[in-house]
Amino acid sequence: MYKLASCCLLFIGFLNPLFSLPLLDSGEVSLQLSAPHEDAPLTSEELERASLLQILPEMLLGAERGDSLRKADSSTNIFNPRGNLRKFQDFSGQDPDILLSHLLARIRKPYKKRETPDCFWKYCV
């Protein structure tokens, strides 16, 4: 019984984000496809998208060698976790690993020394 209830709650929990999406009536919205005009100049958004598509194969091939993040241009909006860590270090003034170890140290219980050295586990001599 508990397993069934927990499965239902888990299923509803996964469906919750789907229920929050707006639903559109298909009769209200008509499908509009626009053909690209070859004579029209490209906008900056289209140029940026084209440059990202050109960089993508290079990044995928470079990921095997591990040098893809070095080749990526800083003007592209590609997530770089090491760059974000450097920004965090500049902002906070300390290494994120040190901060994490301090946070975890507060959670741990302090080690208590035994009062009597004659006792081992729960057996005392």
Swiss-Prot record:
Renumbered to this chain, the signal peptide range is 1-20
GO BP terms, alphabetized:
blood vessel diameter maintenance; regulation of blood pressure
Instruction: Please state where this protein is localized.
Output: Secreted
GO MF, one annotated term: hormone activity
What Pfam families does its record include? Urotensin_II (PF02083)
Give a Gene Ontology cellular component term annotated to this protein: extracellular space
On whether Flavoprotein is a keyword of this UniProt record, the answer is no
UniProt keyword annotation of Secreted present: yes
Q: Which InterPro entries does UniProt cross-reference here? A: Urotensin_II (IPR001483)
Superkingdom in the source lineage = Eukaryota
Question: Keywords assigned by UniProt?
Answer: Cleavage on pair of basic residues, Disulfide bond, Hormone, Secreted, Signal
Query: Which Cys-Cys disulphide bridges does the record give?
Result: C119-C124
- Residues of the propeptide region, as annotated, are 21-111
What the record says about family reads: Belongs to the urotensin-2 family.
Q: What does this protein do?
A: Highly potent vasoconstrictor.
Name-wise, this protein is Urotensin-2
Please report the organism this UniProt entry assigns to the protein: Macaca mulatta (Rhesus macaque)
Q: Which gene encodes it?
A: UTS2
